[in-house]
Amino acid sequence: KQFTKCELSQVLKSMDGYKGVTLPEWICTIFHSSGYDTQTIVKNNGKTEYGLFQINNKMWCRDNQILPSRNICGISCDKFLDDDLTDDVMCAKKILDSEGIDYWLAHKPLCSEKLEQWLCEEL
């Protein structure tokens, strides 16, 4: 599914302020990671990254490519490609708990300031 900024802001409201990361920071980071498209798959340095949050198959989810995956989120990677973001959010929070927001490389250079443009006016 191709989300809009406002749709995504609505769905991800529960993440606002989690571990000190604001909703506009998440929206910005997701935009620069996957363009709000749940179907995004990126192959990168022998890893494959899935979905809105670009969660990789080496550590966080399992697919048929990397064995063994640590599969910390205990989930099949293709679950991050559907429209239901519940499992994506659960895993993203685990990543944040363990790695911090810098797991998402876009965050520091692109999403740590000037965040007004990432707010949804309708909320």
Curated annotation (Swiss-Prot):
Domain of life: Eukaryota
Domain C-type lysozyme: 1-123
Protein location: Secreted
GO CC annotations, alphabetized: extracellular region
Binding positions for Ca(2+) per the UniProt entry: K79, D82, D84, D87, D88
Keyword Chaperone: no
Disulfide cysteine pairs (residue numbers): C6-C120, C28-C111, C61-C77, C73-C91
Pfam family, one: Lys
Keyword vocabulary terms for this entry: Calcium, Disulfide bond, Lactose biosynthesis, Metal-binding, Milk protein, Secreted
Keyword Secreted on entry: yes
InterPro entries reported in the protein's UniProt record: Glyco_hydro_22, Glyco_hydro_22_CS, Lactalbumin, Lysozyme-like_dom_sf
Subunit architecture: Lactose synthase (LS) is a heterodimer of a catalytic component, beta1,4-galactosyltransferase (beta4Gal-T1) and a regulatory component, alpha-lactalbumin (LA).
Protein name as it appears in the record: Alpha-lactalbumin A
Annotated organism of origin: Equus caballus (Horse)
